């Protein structure tokens, strides 16, 4: 009798077991094959913990919008982000202006598809330790006052933390050898603030949005460090997508990803949190041609061959 009951129970549960073993629609294709994860990444321009919090929320949103598994893969530095995009380890990457150009030049058909509302008119800020006696600068020619002082950029491949500040310095007639000692490369905008605030360098340059964000959150001691100049505007951060996603998912997948990014709504609390972490009110469309100035400057200072 017991064996009969067990047999009956097995027959009843078998269909449920078969159903539960099927992959869900987000991880399987129409023919039942496993779907490869859509991978996202970003240049590590800020504190890794902040980036992890941001991208965990974004991947959840994209997964729900796109109906495919989405995975965030952190990278160690700016060059690693470009390499990962080139070899296909990352499908969608949040690049700065320079790294975005570098990545697209290495992947035929790669597209810049979206940027924040602030990225069409982005700025770098030059900051100085208040004990340095470096005074606020009124125009680009005032950058000459930085000669003879120690100075740090951010990452060597940062648009707002290296490329454009070096460009404006050269426009003012300031060469890297005019600074005291070896020029610094802090590795991130947050680190630049910390080094100048601590007096390790008398001055530095970084992303304006990161500066404002850290000031607003009380992470900067304004008794020790201040902004001395804001650059003219330029195009900067943007999303770049690999064209191979069309083969893997669908012909319209690039358009679907772009639509999902543009759809982020500040009136929806969960989506506003994502936008706030990006320092944006919304995402807007962009295209490859917007970064022609960045490419020209990159070639001029030897960051693009």
Language-model segments: residues:
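A bilobed periplasmic-binding-protein/Venus flytrap-type ligand-binding module shared by bacterial periplasmic
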Residues: 44, 124-136, 235-249
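C-terminal motif of bacterial Sec signal peptides marking the signal peptidase cleavage site
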Residues: 15-18
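Ligand-binding cleft/hinge of the Venus flytrap
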Residues: 56-67, 159-185, 215-221, 296-304
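Short helix-initiation/N-cap motifs at beta->coil->alpha
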Residues: 72-83, 96-98, 176-194
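An extracytoplasmic/periplasmic, membrane-proximal ligand-sensing/linker region
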Residues: 33-41, 46-57, 234, 240, ...
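A conserved helix-loop-strand patch within extracytoplasmic ligand-binding domains
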Residues: 116-172
